[in-house]
Each structure stands twice: as C-alpha cells, then as structure tokens.
Amino acid sequence: ALRRSKETPSVLICAGTGCIAGGALKIYENLKNECESRGLPVYIGLKHDSDEEKSLHVKMSGCHGFCEMGPLVHIEPMGVMYIHVKPEDCHEILEKTVLGGEVIDRLVYHLDGTAYPKQEDIPFYKKQHRVVLENCGTSDAEDIEEIRHTSYTERVNVPNAAARIAFN
C-alpha cells in the first residue's frame, strides 16, 4: 500500500460514472502529463508497492456523490473541492493549488454569493454522516489488506438486540 504522510499532497479525481461521462479520464491524463512534464516526484494511480515517499499523489477515486457538479477534483490535505473541472484547468490546478497552496475561486462551489472551497463546508455535504463512502479517495480498492481493515462490514453497527435475534 502507498505509504505517505498526512502532508503529502493528493489530487483525487472522481471516477464515478457521472464524472467520467463529463471528462474525468481526460482530467486524470492531463494532470498526469503535467506532473511528468515538470519532472515532479509523483505517484500516479492506486497501487504503490514501494516504501519511497513521493511529493505528490494523483489518483482516481470513487464517486464523491455530488454528481451534478462533476467532474470533481479533491485536493488533500487542503480539503479543497473543485467542481465542473475541465481538462484545460489541470495546469492551473497544479500550479496554483497543488504547488502554490492557492484556491482557484472560479472552480469552487458557490451558493447565494458564498464560496465554499472545502468539501466539508459545502451545504450538500455539511449535514451528511458518511458511512460507506467515509474512506472515498483514501482507501486503496486494489489492496486486499486495506480492504480488510476498512471494509463495509466494519461500518455496520448492528444493535445488540438485533444481533441476539439474528444469531439465536
């Protein structure tokens, strides 16, 4: 599994069907090419067998649930969520946000004149308690050990009474 610190920047491109239909695969390719053309020490993809730390991680993630705003790009550790991203935005995202720490206002969610750069502050997500999608973009779906430790079954909380009935 990929070993990286909490400070290692991660660019997560939503790979849900809506985002893919909107061009997410081209966004992924453009970000990958931008990184490679700059010679950035970057890890591209989900599975990483080396212990070597990289300065940037670019990967496709599961659906973020905000399909009508896709394609979505989520940048960690900043927590920034970009909406309606186009392939031609990749250079600016890499330059300004990933390398420069600057938020690109035109790519963040706006509602009633208020900008919401962080996913956690977007009203759509604000009152959600994510259970199944809690690890979306952070867990590696190709790593069986990680799946074992972050599986859906761990997320299920069966009340004691129901468990007694089911197992008696």
Show which residues each predicted segment covers.
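Feature of Fe-S/electron-transfer and energy-metabolism proteins
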Residues: 1-168
